[in-house]
Amino acid sequence: MEAEEQEKYVTYRFNKTLVRKLTHFEGDQLDKFMVRYRPTYEFVSQADEVILNQYILNCSYKFKIELLRQDAPKQNTTDN
């Protein structure tokens, strides 16, 4: 029961409305981000609004870099 309450609290603080507002992610990108960067209960319970927002922004920068690397064409490193 305690674990369920903790998960609800994390979901309450780390929610799609807040993440969308800060990151401008939508749809599949938003869903993937929310799963990949979901914070722990310990972090969320100790973080104030500013710290949580900064966490989300920092993670969004990492996520955007990951997306760019995935979308970048594979470069051939051998010269002809």
Annotated model-derived regions:
Residues 1-80:
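Short beta-strand and adjacent turn/loop elements
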